[in-house]
Amino acid sequence: MFLPTTREEMKKLGWRELDVILVTGDAYVDHPSFGVALIGHYLVSHGFKVGIIAQPDWRTEKDITRLGRPRLFFGVTAGNVDSMVANYTASKKKRKTDDYTPGGSGGKRPDRATIVYTNLIKRFFPEVPVVLGGLEASLRRFAHYDWWSEKVRKSILIDSKVDLLVYGMGEKAVLEIAQILSRTGDIEKCKSVRGVVWWSSQKPEGGIELPSYDEISENPEKYAEALKLQTWYTDPYKNILIYQKQDTRYVVQNPPQLPLSQEELDRLYLLPFEREVHPFYAKMGRVKAIETVKFSITAVRGCFGSCSFCALTQHQTTHVSYRSKDSILEEVRILTKKKDFKGTITDVGGPTANLYGSSCSIRETKGQCQKFCLYPSVCKIVRPNHDEFISLLESIRKIPGVRNVFVSSGIRHDFVLAEKDPDVFIRELVKYTPGQLKLAPEHAHPKVLSLMRKPPVELFLEFKRRFETLAKKIGKRKYVIGYFIVGHPGEGWRENNYLRDFILKHLGYFPQQIQIFTPTPGTVSTAMYYSGLDPFTGEKVHVERSLKVRNKMKENVLFKKKGREKR
């Protein structure tokens, strides 16, 4: 079932008005990999009428008014990615293309889309509550360093002039907001909901106070301190309120929602998604973003890898939840009935596929302890369950109509190597790899890897050796390729040349999977970039801020110039 995007579609459903209208910076793709589709179907499954306005023209009222006034609220998201990341390259050049836009052309979503869409709504529907959500809002919920303007900005809640922001995976919080507004019509009563951020003119009682906006704007050390506190105390099982003074107001973060249970996840992903681009947008052109996920399966949520540069850990938390085998197999059966299904499940995973079935007795009862689960090595309390993941893949492959099952969404090779006999899993993984297994060592120099919270590169080489040896034994030509980041805090020319030499010596190919680090809001790495400090150790960190030098670092690793750079 597609959710309505026009009045005509509302009439076909017999709906005179909508309870909630969701506004997004992406094209409307009715697939569970797209947040608006998830939230929309979740609300509909609980009896609410929901419509979607995707990529509205922000220069006119034509799009934003086409569904009328919602009974309860507008929900606003920039889309699956931060709008500034969507619109600009790592060199701050305007992108000409956008995979989330029909036809692939850039310019269909504004910079700082959450703020722009909210202002548009307030212009034409000033009395209707607006609730922010999605990655852009979630990662900008407190004062944050904005690389594109090179300054610390206030919470997007303040900049948008709204009352409520949902952070993290928002199904439960959005449903509670809808239920409260339906009963009372009072947005103030929604400020008790877990997983929301709100503002107050009064200082909250209790909780953790972060350094203020003024403090972190003037003192980078305070910025690093604020990020550390936010990271440690944003945990559903610690149940702690966090707040930050911004001018005369306080931005208040309620404790996160508890992760969805397995039963809740199962029901969510089996809602009646069309798994297609909505016809209203499909007629405007191809939406490239659906092509890699259309026949994929989300099996896992959350990741306890805690990579410094990763926004997903900050957004989905370190708490891993996963779906039951029965639910996943039912979704596969649904996919096999699609007319354009050609027998291949392109991915079974999530942020990190092989965390499926894993557990930790401490995290599940007391919350994240003040240690990293996988850094500097895999914690002994964390329990992997690779057997269950392989059993799941085998069961999928036996379903009539399925010829291939692949794992494409990331494997933590250090987690595999922590097993007593890693080859048991690796041997099976070979069968579920489409020619090349993509891993993310990210760098080679020990200092940079330590700041990234990534394992030693020797573990990548060990996994690569085992994988390719086992593939060869069964007569398969399958290889491991690596993804790398340059320009991350801690990298200078010495570390960059170290990475170049590592690739030349150990990989034997010219890599194309090189990206320049982009300081996105809310991550540990961005705190390092702004402050020049490691938030968790207080140690000084070298930061390369020159765009010209960062581009040269990429060229150096891509072997576009002969010889090593000398600096």
Swiss-Prot record:
Keyword annotations of the record: 4Fe-4S, Iron, Iron-sulfur, Metal-binding, S-adenosyl-L-methionine
Radical SAM core domain segment(s): 288-560
SUPFAM superfamilies found in the cross-reference section: Radical SAM enzymes
Pfam families to which the protein is assigned, alphabetical: DUF3362, Radical_SAM, Radical_SAM_N
SMART domains: Elp3
GO molecular function: 4 iron, 4 sulfur cluster binding; catalytic activity; iron ion binding
Co-factor binding comment: Binds 1 [4Fe-4S] cluster. The cluster is coordinated with 3 cysteines and an exchangeable S-adenosyl-L-methionine.
Entry cofactors: [4Fe-4S] cluster
Domain of life: Bacteria
Positions of [4Fe-4S] cluster binding: 303, 307, 310
HAMAP family attached to this UniProt entry: UPF0313 (MF_01251)
Protein family: Belongs to the UPF0313 family.
Protein name: UPF0313 protein Tpet_0582
